Each structure stands twice: as structure tokens, then as C-alpha cells.
């Protein structure tokens, strides 16, 4: 047997065909579902096979033959996770092997483990770049930091890392967007709000202290020249200059006497360190582009590793939660802290999370696409921004549940939007009134006079919203063309009928048998509607008739046999809706 590839175990020889007992099949299914939960829909056959053989050692001699069944069940479990969400995987596992969920509960405790170090006065921070609104990926930082802050009755700082005026410049509106989105996502206001651009005097002061202390210097080498020094582990000539000379050049940098790209301030470390990224790393550079808040007041701006390190110390940050790809930032900043004689905060890391439906988006890329009119704006329903998700009808509770589910793991994982949609369904279902939406409608006339004048349909099938939708209707109704077959059916929540081409005869108001149930709509209670459905880079539009009963703009409804959608606008001719999810 060789190592698993693409999550499936392969064998060098064809296994013999064995018809497995239902008991063995159930064991394999149990561990496949359990593994899919642990790996967020990317279960591993090798791991599943190991667990099966651990529980049933008598199967070890048949391991090769077992591979086919294991691969099949792992593929099935992963497909359920992708198409229906993790809650569906968990539901199936709980239905026949609830004890297998205990392992997940233990792992959740690990995923949301206690913070290391001193936790009496916890201070955390969430530090976005205000070059656009928050994305679903950003929301992880809001949620996880807020969760820990709440657990330890600590403080959370919202810090805008906005000291890049050239590559990813700030958008002035984004400050308010992000602050409001932070509150929406976390359910609370940040304890402190910091705009790094307004803290420039602090960074300039610390840079001067660093240069005066001899552990920072002005480097006049070009980027290519210093790259060669770094690769060869040699010190550049600028490193040995007197402090006074460095301070003179620092003054020239600050006053605009040196052009962009001609000088940087570096942190003196060790040019022989094994990690090239740590060798005399750049702390401040020249940027003459104006800033949307402070204008052209400053010519020298700190790079993120320096600015973030200084501000973390100034705010008393005790724990930093960041991506595992930023470990080098921790190492750089630790060296700077040692120079200043400070104690570095406790770092925690998480791995990347890829969401299948949103593979290649970046904030700067989205902005470019908005400017080129590929997207209508930051709330375009095809985008993974919080603005877009919120506009479609996703709740902050569902986003919190998603990140709580994933926890603080250093593993890179890949999930489907179906997982978030599953959480959102659970959160909003009890507050969503039901309505009917008929696609490709067919008109049917009642051929009998024994129909009541009013049909009373529950606002919510489980009664969480009291009251009924009382339909007063005429002789005609609409049904969906896919349901238009001559024969006996039940009109949902109304009557047993027999359809004969384009007419229907009521047979009984009570349900008398197990005939198919179809949804329907009185003609006089119908309005034309369009539902806009995001589909990758496309927007599909589905036309039909909607139930015209107490509709409200901005409200999410569940349309039976169709899914959740939000009403965007209502006029005399048309109701426009935005698709949410199944």
C-alpha cells in the first residue's frame, strides 16, 4: 500500500472483491463521517482505515480489500460536507453513532484552547488595513479575538494599519465601514480604536531612539544591492556608519531631501542569521504619496512589522493571533523587542482557510474590478465581503458559529459555503415567514364549486411565528410546470385534488392518502418576481410569481421548495429579490 493521494488510499495490487457485513460498513461510515468533521470536509482515507483497523483488529488481514469501501465512504462523507455543509455530516453521524462525536468535542476544546501565559489582564487586537471593507476572511480575526476577549473579560483594540500610502492606500470611507462591521460581527464595540496614521509621532520617536541607540541605521543601498548582501550574509557598508551620520540622513529622509527608494531605516540584527528575512530587516521607508487622513505631512512611513510592534507595546497587547504565514513577523518583532528591552506578547497562529466558492479574491483586486465595473460595488452578491454577505441576509451569529467551529488550528483547511449556509439556516429559520414562489407557472382552474373562500396557511410551519396567511382566492391558481402532471396531488396546507390537464377538482380538504404534495398560489394573490442568484462570476435571474401577502422590503423569507431570499424592492410591476441560500 502506498501513501494516500488526494485523500484516497491506493494499492499496488487489485484487492479481492468482498461483500462486507452491515456492521463493518457502519464502522467504516462512522469513521469516515467523523474524519470529515475533523478535517472540515476533506477527510483522509489513510486516517479512516487506521481507525477502523484499531477498532477491529480482526480486519487487519483484509486491509487491502477494505480500501475500496473506505475510499467510497470517505468520498461520500466529503461530498455531503461540500454540498450540504458540516451540520448535515454531524446530523448523520449523530443519528447512528453519537458516541463518535465525543472525539470532535475534545478537538473543539483544543481548537479553542486557553490562551497561554498570563491572562489576568488580557489585551488583544484586530488590525485590518482600511483599503476596503472587511471580507469573510477578515471576520475570522474579529470573531476569534472577540471570543477570547469575552472569555477573559479582557480588552480588544481595533487598530487600523494604514501607514502604506503607495501600494495599498487607505480608503477614507473604510474606517467607518470596518468599525461598524466589527460591531455587527462581534456584537460589541472595540474598547480602543487606533489609526496608525494618527500615531506617527510615536513611530518617529521610536525610530530616532533606535537610530540613536545604535540598533537602527539608514541604509542607502539599492534594493538589488542589499539583496546581494543578504544572500551572501555580508554586511552592507551603511551598517558601520556613525550614529551622527545616520541621524543626519534620517533628517534628510524626514524633510524630503532624499527621494523614494533611495534610503530605508533598517533594524540591526545579524547578517548571518539562518533565516534571510531576519537579516537587518527594513523598518521605515520614504513615501511621498499623500495620506487620506494626514495628507502629505510625513515623508517617511513605518513598514508594518515596525509599526505593529511599536503599537502593540504601546497598547499593552498581551496576545497576538495571526496567520501561520506571519511567523517571520513574530521573529522580526521579537528581535526589535529585545533591542528595546520589552517583553513580546504571546503569539498564537492559525492556518489558511480556503472557501471553495471564493478562491482568488483580494481587497485590492476587488477594488480594481469595481472600478472597471465588473462588480456593481462592495456589496455585489458575488463577492465574499461582509457587505455582500450581510446584504444577502447572512446573520452575524452564523459567521461567529463558522469560526467557532473551525477554531484556532494551524492546519490549512478548505470549506464550502454550504457550511456557513447551514449555520445561517439554523439561526434565521424560526424568524423567517414562509411564502410561495412559483417558477414557470401553469394556470389551473377549479372545476368544482366546493372550495372554501379562504385558505389559512401558517406563517411558519412549526408555529414559531404565530398566525396564518389568509388567502382569499378566485377560481384559478398557479402551480409549477414541473408539478403539472394529470393525477391526484395535494395542494400544500389546503386540499387533496385531482388535476386533469388545466383543471382541478377538490376531492377532500383533509389529507386522505400519501399522494404527492405540491405548492401552489392563488392567481389573485400573485405578483411577478425576479430572484437574482449569484453563481460564480455570473448573476442568474429566475422569473416567476410570488405570493403577494404582506411583503416587506429588506426582509428575508423562506420560499418553500426553493430556499431563502431577501426582498430588495417592490413596485407596481415587479418584486425584486436576492437569493440567500437553500
Predicted regions and their residues:
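N-terminal Rossmann-like or analogous alpha/beta NTP/dinucleotide-binding catalytic cores
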Residues: 4-238, 324-348, 352-357, 363, ...
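Extended, domain-scale alpha-helical bundle/helix-rich regions
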Residues: 39-56, 60-63, 377-459
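C-terminal accessory/binding modules appended to enzymatic or scaffolding proteins
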Residues: 119, 450-582
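Structured alpha-helical segments in the cores of large, soluble enzyme domains
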Residues: 140-150, 175-182, 296, 300-308, ...
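Short acidic (Asp/Glu) and glycine-rich catalytic loops that position anionic groups and cofactors
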Residues: 154-158, 186-187, 309-317, 365-366, ...
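Charge-rich, well-structured scaffold segments of protease-associated domains
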Residues: 173-184, 209-212, 395, 405-408, ...
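Active-site cores that bind ATP or allylic diphosphates and position pyrophosphate for catalysis
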Residues: 209, 213-366, 372-374, 385, ...
Amino acid at each position: 500500500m502506498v501513501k494516500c493521494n488526494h485523500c484516497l488510499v491506493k494499492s499496488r495490487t487489485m484487492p479481492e472483491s468482498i461483500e462486507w457485513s452491515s456492521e463493518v460498513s457502519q464502522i467504516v461510515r462512522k469513521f469516515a463521517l467523523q474524519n470529515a468533521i475533523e478535517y472540515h470536509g476533506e477527510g483522509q482515507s489513510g486516517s479512516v482505515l487506521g481507525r477502523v483497523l484499531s477498532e477491529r483488529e480482526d480486519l487487519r488481514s483484509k486491509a487491502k480489500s477494505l480500501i475500496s469501501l473506505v475510499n467510497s465512504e470517505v468520498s461520500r462523507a466529503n461530498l455531503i460536507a461540500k454540498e450540504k455543509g458540516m451540520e448535515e455530516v454531524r446530523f448523520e453521524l449523530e443519528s447512528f453513532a453519537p458516541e463518535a462525536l465525543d472525539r470532535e468535542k475534545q478537538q473543539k476544546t483544543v481548537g479553542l484552547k486557553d490562551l497561554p501565559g498570563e491572562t489576568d489582564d488580557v489585551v488583544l487586537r484586530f488590525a485590518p488595513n482600511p483599503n476596503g471593507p472587511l471580507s469573510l476572511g477578515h471576520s475570522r480575526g474579529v470573531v476569534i479575538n472577540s471570543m477570547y476577549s469575552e472569555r477573559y473579560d479582557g480588552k480588544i483594540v481595533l487598530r487600523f494599519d494604514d501607514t502604506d500610502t503607495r501600494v495599498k492606500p487607505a480608503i477614507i470611507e473604510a474606517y467607518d465601514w470596518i468599525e461598524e462591521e466589527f460591531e455587527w460581527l462581534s456584537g460589541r464595540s472595540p474598547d480602543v480604536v487606533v489609526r496608525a496614521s494618527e500615531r506617527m509621532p510615536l513611530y518617529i520617536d521610536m525610530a530616532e531612539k533606535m537610530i540613536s541607540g545604535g540598533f537602527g541605521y539608514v541604509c542607502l543601498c539599492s534594493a538589488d544591492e542589499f539583496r546581494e548582501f543578504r544572500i551572501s550574509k555580508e554586511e552592507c557598508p551603511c551598517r558601520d556608519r556613525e550614529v551622527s551620520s545616520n541621524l543626519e540622513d534620517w533628517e534628510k529622509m524626514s524633510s524630503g531631501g532624499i527621494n523614494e527608494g533611495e534610503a530605508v531605516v533598517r533594524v540591526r540584527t545579524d547578517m548571518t542569521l539562518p533565516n534571510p528575512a531576519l537579516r537587518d530587516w527594513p523598518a521605515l521607508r520614504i513615501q511621498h504619496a499623500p495620506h487620506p487622513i494626514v495628507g502629505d505631512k510625513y515623508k517617511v512611513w513605518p513598514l508594518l512589522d515596525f509599526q505593529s510592534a511599536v503599537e502593540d507595546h504601546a497598547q499593552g497587547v498581551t496576545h497576538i493571533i495571526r496567520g501561520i504565514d506571519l511567523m517571520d513577523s513574530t521573529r522580526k518583532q521579537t528581535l526589535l523587542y529585545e533591542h528595546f528591552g520589552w517583553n513580546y506578547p504571546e503569539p498564537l497562529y492559525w492556518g489558511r482557510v480556503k472557501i471553495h466558492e471564493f478562491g482568488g479574491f483580494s481587497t485590492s483586486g476587488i477594488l480594481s474590478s469595481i472600478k472597471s465595473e465588473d462588480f456593481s460595488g462592495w456589496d455585489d452578491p458575488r463577492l465574499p465581503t461582509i457587505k455582500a454577505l450581510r446584504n444577502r441576509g447572512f446573520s452575524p451569529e452564523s459567521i461567529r458559529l463558522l469560526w467557532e467551529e473551525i477554531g484556532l488550528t494551524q492546519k490549512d483547511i478548505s470549506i464550502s459555503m454550504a457550511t456557513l449556509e447551514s449555520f445561517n439556516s439554523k439561526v434565521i429559520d424560526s424568524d423567517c415567514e414562509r411564502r410561495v414562489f412559483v417558477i414557470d407557472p401553469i394556470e389551473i382552474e377549479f372545476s368544482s364549486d366546493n372550495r372554501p373562500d379562504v385558505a389559512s396557511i401558517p406563517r411558519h410551519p412549526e408555529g414559531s411565528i404565530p398566525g396564518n396567511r389568509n388567502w382569499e382566492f378566485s377560481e384559478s391558481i398557479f402551480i409549477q410546470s414541473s408539478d403539472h402532471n394529470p393525477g391526484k396531488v395535494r395542494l400544500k396546507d389546503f386540499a387533496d385534488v385531482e388535476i386533469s390537464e388545466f383543471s382541478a377538482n377538490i376531492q377532500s380538504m383533509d389529507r386522505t392518502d400519501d399522494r404527492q404534495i405540491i405548492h401552489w398560489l392563488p392567481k389573485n394573490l400573485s405578483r411577478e418576481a425576479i430572484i437574482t442568484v449569484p453563481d460564480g462570476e455570473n448573476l442568474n435571474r429566475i422569473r416567476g410569481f410570488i405570493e403577494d401577502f404582506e411583503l416587506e422590503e429588506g426582509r428575508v423569507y423562506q420560499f418553500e421548495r426553493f430556499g431563502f431570499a431577501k426582498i430588495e424592492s417592490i413596485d407596481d410591476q415587479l418584486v425584486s429579490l436576492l437569493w440567500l441560500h437553500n
